[in-house]
């Protein structure tokens, strides 16, 4: 009987991708099969995120909940950014943990487990071997018509509030040809939509073959677009400072680039943006969006917002709200600022009461919600092309898929439509999802 691994993933799409790779590595090396039931696992892994407040405490809380499973010989590992940040301190606080590994050393997981068994003591490897891990990863096991592809690692921006450069290292781009080979391999397995991943994905600068030539992100997008079978291209997360004119122009040339962009602004006050060390102004950010919407008028935008950064005044907050009104976001991810240990912003004086921060956050989220509802309502009666992902979460007898703009659409349809692109007439709209009916021609094609 095969061994089973349970992986709990926290945080961003990069972590989701890394968790998939952990599963692939363990399957190729040791025959592990994934399980969603922690009680039947032989190996339990926590792929952690250190971006939010009290991330470490959440990890130790989860570890405490599975500690009793050690009695039947279960192995426990901690990976991801908290592992990179805390290292051996995790073992000191939770000595029942068997392995601790960082985002750049997940490919060494089978070796770490073997060494743990051989030496009978916990193993820690949180080094930064740059892009080495991609040379040791087995081919991806595809599930569904969508897939993530990591094209670069790390971040060199050093925003004053962010731990990512310290936990994932500096920016390193994968070789251009390696990315194309991976995408082509996914297309051969039936993948129709790829999401290119990186902490600052549009900062990609990949070496091209044996030449000294470097491919920028726009060039990579063009080549990915030419791969047969790939019908949609997404990417996250992009940085406003890396949004070059060539990338903007790509939206005119490449119809496979979806009509959705996640471009985190974080704030709308130039004073706060400077304190965050973001490197752009609110006007420069909006200028980029104006250029994009001149090419794609219906481009759906999403963003990240931090409320209550140290020193934020009511005027600063109002400037953020004006930016939100000016742009019109399809969705957003918004949080109250929480200091991350070791970052420059953690040393800043913060005298804004929590109640004020909470009020501002609630106001921001209510404003975004109003925008989302209005945009959803505007979709009524339109025809949206969706990629069918599988059974609906609301009703397992129905199907769900996503529009180019990343809106969920639920509809009645045959299971044979899963993995296909179909046109849907939108008949109902709620804040978070749409409902529709399959056009007759798509039903006939699949009959």
Swiss-Prot record:
[4Fe-4S] cluster 1 binds at residues 12, 49, 81. [4Fe-4S] cluster 2 binds at residues 155, 159, 162. Binds 2 [4Fe-4S] clusters. One cluster is coordinated with 3 cysteines and an exchangeable S-adenosyl-L-methionine. The keyword S-adenosyl-L-methionine applies. Signal peptide: none annotated. Residues 377-440 form the TRAM domain. Residues 3-118 form the MTTase N-terminal domain. GO terms for molecular function: 4 iron, 4 sulfur cluster binding; metal ion binding; N6-isopentenyladenosine methylthiotransferase activity. It is found in: Cytoplasm. InterPro entries: Elp3/MiaA/NifB-like_rSAM, Methylthiotransferase, Methylthiotransferase_CS, Methylthiotransferase_N, Methylthiotransferase_N_sf, MiaB_methiolase, rSAM, rSAM_horseshoe. Its EC number is 2.8.4.3. The keyword S-adenosyl-L-methionine applies. GO terms for cellular component: cytosol. It catalyses: N(6)-dimethylallyladenosine(37) in tRNA + (sulfur carrier)-SH + AH2 + 2 S-adenosyl-L-methionine = 2-methylsulfanyl-N(6)-dimethylallyladenosine(37) in tRNA + (sulfur carrier)-H + 5'-deoxyadenosine + L-methionine + A + S-adenosyl-L-homocysteine + 2 H(+). Residues 141-374 form the Radical SAM core domain. Its cofactor is [4Fe-4S] cluster. Gene3D superfamilies: Methylthiotransferase, N-terminal domain (3.40.50.12160), tm_1862 like domain (3.80.30.20). SMART domains: Elp3. Catalyzes the methylthiolation of N6-(dimethylallyl)adenosine (i(6)A), leading to the formation of 2-methylthio-N6-(dimethylallyl)adenosine (ms(2)i(6)A) at position 37 in tRNAs that read codons beginning with uridine. HAMAP family: tRNA_metthiotr_MiaB. PANTHER family: CDK5 REGULATORY SUBUNIT-ASSOCIATED PROTEIN 1 (PTHR43020), MITOCHONDRIAL TRNA METHYLTHIOTRANSFERASE CDK5RAP1 (PTHR43020:SF2). Monomer. Belongs to the methylthiotransferase family. MiaB subfamily. This is tRNA-2-methylthio-N(6)-dimethylallyladenosine synthase. The lineage of its organism: Bacteria, Pseudomonadati, Pseudomonadota, Betaproteobacteria, Burkholderiales.
């Amino acid at each position: 009987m095969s061994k089973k691994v349970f992986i709990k993933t926290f945080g961003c799409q990069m972590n989701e991708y890394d968790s998939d790779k952990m599963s692939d590595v363990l399957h190729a090396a040791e025959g592990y099969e994934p399980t969603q039931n922690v009680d039947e696992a032989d190996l339990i892994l926590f792929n952690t995120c250190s971006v939010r407040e009290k991330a470490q405490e959440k990890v130790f809380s989860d570890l405490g909940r599975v500690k009793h499973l050690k009695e039947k010989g279960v192995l426990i590992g901690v990976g991801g950014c908290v592992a990179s940040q805390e290292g051996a301190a995790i073992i000191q606080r939770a000595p029942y943990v068997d392995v601790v590994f960082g985002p750049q050393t997940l490919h060494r997981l089978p070796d770490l487990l073997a060494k743990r068994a051989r030496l009978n003591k916990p193993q820690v490897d949180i080094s930064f071997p740059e892009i080495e891990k991609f040379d040791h990863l087995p081919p991806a096991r595809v599930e569904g018509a969508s897939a993530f592809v990591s094209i670069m690692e790390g971040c060199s921006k050093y925003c004053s509030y962010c731990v990512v450069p310290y936990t994932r290292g500096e920016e390193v781009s994968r070789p251009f040809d390696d990315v194309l080979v991976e995408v082509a391999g996914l297309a051969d397995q039936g993948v129709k939509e790829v999401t290119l991943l990186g902490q600052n994905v549009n900062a990609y600068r990949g070496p091209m073959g044996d030449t000294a030539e470097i491919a920028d992100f726009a060039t990579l997008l063009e080549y990915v677009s030419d791969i047969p079978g790939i019908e949609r291209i997404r990417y996250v997360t992009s940085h406003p400072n890396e949004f070059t004119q060539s990338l903007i122009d790509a939206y005119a040339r490449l119809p496979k680039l979806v009509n959705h962009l996640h471009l985190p602004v974080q704030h709308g006050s130039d004073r706060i943006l400077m304190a965050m060390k973001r490197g752009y102004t609110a006007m420069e950010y909006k200028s980029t969006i104006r250029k994009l919407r001149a090419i794609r008028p219906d481009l759906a935008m999403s963003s990240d917002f931090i409320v209550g950064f140290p020193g934020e005044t009511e005027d600063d907050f109002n400037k953020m709200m004006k930016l939100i009104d000016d742009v019109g976001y399809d969705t957003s991810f918004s949080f109250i600022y929480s200091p991350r240990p070791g970052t420059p912003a953690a040393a800043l004086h913060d005298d804004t009461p929590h109640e004020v921060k909470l009020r501002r956050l609630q106001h921001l989220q209510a404003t975004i919600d109003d925008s989302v509802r209005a945009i959803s309502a505007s979709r009524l009666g339109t025809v949206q092309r969706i990629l069918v992902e599988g059974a609906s979460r609301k009703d397992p007898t129905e199907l769900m898929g996503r529009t180019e703009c990343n809106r969920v659409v639920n509809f009645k349809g045959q299971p044979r439509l899963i993995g296909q692109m179909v046109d849907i007439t939108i008949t109902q709209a709620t804040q978070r999802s749409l409902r529709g009916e399959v056009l007759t021609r798509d039903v006939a094609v699949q009959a």
